[in-house]
C-alpha cells in the first residue's frame, strides 16, 4: 500500500497549535496529515515548563471542553498544580501547572498516535501549491507533494527564525532546530502583510549547583487541582516545589554595564522584532523599571528525571559570559552551572487582520494560520487557535459553514476577535481583563459553555459527552434539591445553621436562598444538613451560580441587547467609499480591516458609534433596495 498523497486537511507544524489543529480535524472525521520537521519534538514545550495561569487557563479549559489534548496532557505531566487568585472572585481564578517536559510531550504524542483519521509524517514543508487564489497542497523539503484543499500553518518561531546571543546571531527555529527559510520566502510572495516579532528564553541551570536553603519554597496546592474536566488527581505524577529568589543591585549593575553588548540595545540594533510586553527580558526590566531594586525569579523544575531548572524571570539575549555573571549574582545561585544559554529569537509573523474569524486567510482560500504566525505568544493561545483552525479546516473540507465562538461565549472568541479586528504590533498574550464578560467566561464553566457545541461539531467523543451530560444533570438536580428543601427557625436544623454561620433565621428559607447569602457557603450547608453533591465540580457550579446570580443575569441581559447588532453581517462586496457621512479616515480603516460583522466594525480603533449608525442605515437602505429589485 502506498503512502497516501491526498488528504482533506494538512497541518504544518507539530507544536501546541499544530497538534490541536491536527487532532481537531481528525476528530471531526477529516482525513488529516500532520507534517513535522521532527517527530521527536511533537508537543515540545519550547520555553517555560508550565501550562495555564491568569487568562491562559481559561483557554486551556476551553480547549479541553472542545475535546482537545492540552489539559489532559497537563494532568498526565503536571508536577505542581496551583490555583492563582484563589481568594478573589471566580471570574479571575486560574489554574497553573508546572509540567515535566518529557511526560507532557509523551502524553501529547500518545494522544496523536492513537487518533483515528490522522497520519503523522516527518518532513519540513518548503512550498505551498496555490492555484487561482486557492491552496491545493504542499511540497516538502525532499520534493514530496501532498494535496488538500485545506492547509493549516502552525509554524511557531520557525519562519525566518534568527537566534541572538549577544551580538552573534545564527539561523534557527529554536535552539537545536533549523528554521523554515524556504517556506518563509514562499509566504512573503503572497499578498499578506508580514512583520517580525521577538521572544526569548532564560539560561537553564543545573539544580545540583543551586542552594535552595536560602530561597523561599513555593509548594503546590492541597488538595491538588486538576486541569481537565475529565482528569483526576490520581493521574498526576509525583508533586514537587518551586522556589523563589530575587535579583539585586549587583545583578542590575552587571546588566547595565553590558547593555552595549545586548542585541536589543547595542548601537548596531541587531534585533528589529518587538518582544512580549508582559514577559520582558531581564535587560528590558532593568531598562524600563530602573527604579526597582529587585525582581522576582521563580526557580521551576524542568522534570522529575532531570536536575535542570528554569529560572523564570531572567530571559536574556546577553552574551554567555554576562549571563553567567547575572545568574551567579542571584542569591542561592552563586555557584550555579548553566546547562544551556538563554537567547532571543526573531521570526516572521503575519498581520492577523488578513484573516477571517475562521482563521482562514482572506486572500488564499483554504489556507489557515494558527499560533505565533498570527502574532500571539504562549502555548495556550497557540493551542486555542490551532483547535479552531483545525476544526474550520475540516468544516471547509466537508463543505460546511465555519464556526467561531463570540466574545460572550469564550475566551477563544475574545482572542480571535482581538487579533482579526485590532491586529497586533507585539506578541499578544491573553488576560482576563481582555474579556468584557468575565463572570460568564469563567474557567470552571468552560464545559457548560462549549461542550454541547463541540459535540455538535464532532469534536467531543462519547466518553466526554456522557460525563458532561451527567454533570449538567447533577447540577440541575442539586439546584432543585436546594430549592425544595426548607428550613424553619426554631427547628434543630434551623438552629444548627444559625449557630454555624452566626445568622439567625427570621422566617422560613429554602437552602438555595440561604446559599445566596455571602456569609453562607455550600460546604457549611453540607456539614449541617449531611447532604450535598459528591462531585466537587457540581458543588462549585451550584455555589457560583447561586451567589452571583444577579450579576450573571445583568451580563446576560447586556449580551442579549448587543447581540442583534453584533451578529449583523456586512456584505463582502461593500464599498465604504460610497457610504455618505463616513470620514475618509474611517472609510480607510474599514476598507483595510474588511470586518465581517457590525460588532467587529465597532471595535476597530477610530470607528465611532456615529459611523456604526451610518453603516446600519446603509444596510437597511441596501436591503430595501434589493427587495424593490426583486419585486420588480
Curated annotation (Swiss-Prot):
Q: Which GO terms describe its molecular function?
A: flavin adenine dinucleotide binding
Q: Name one GO biological process term.
A: tRNA wobble uridine modification
State its cofactor: FAD
Its principal location? Answer: cytoplasm
Q: Which SMART domains does this entry report, sorted A to Z?
A: GIDA_assoc_3
Q: Which GO terms describe its cellular component?
A: cytosol
Q: Which residues bind FAD?
A: 13-18
Q: Which UniProt keywords apply?
A: Cytoplasm, FAD, Flavoprotein, NAD, tRNA processing
Residues annotated to bind NAD(+)? 275-289
Q: Does the keyword Nucleotidyltransferase apply?
A: no
Please give the Pfam families that the UniProt record associates with this protein.
Answer: GIDA (PF01134), GIDA_C_1st (PF21680), SAM_GIDA_C (PF13932)
InterPro entries listed in its UniProt record = FAD/NAD-bd_sf, GIDA_C_N, MnmG, MnmG-rel, MnmG-rel_CS, MnmG_C, MnmG_C_subdom, MnmG_C_subdom_sf
Its domain of life reads: Bacteria
Q: Where in or outside the cell is it found?
A: Cytoplasm
Q: Quaternary structure? A: Homodimer. Heterotetramer of two MnmE and two MnmG subunits.
Family statement: Belongs to the MnmG family.
Annotated function: NAD-binding protein involved in the addition of a carboxymethylaminomethyl (cmnm) group at the wobble position (U34) of certain tRNAs, forming tRNA-cmnm(5)s(2)U34.
Return the protein name: tRNA uridine 5-carboxymethylaminomethyl modification enzyme MnmG
Q: What gene is this protein a product of?
A: mnmG
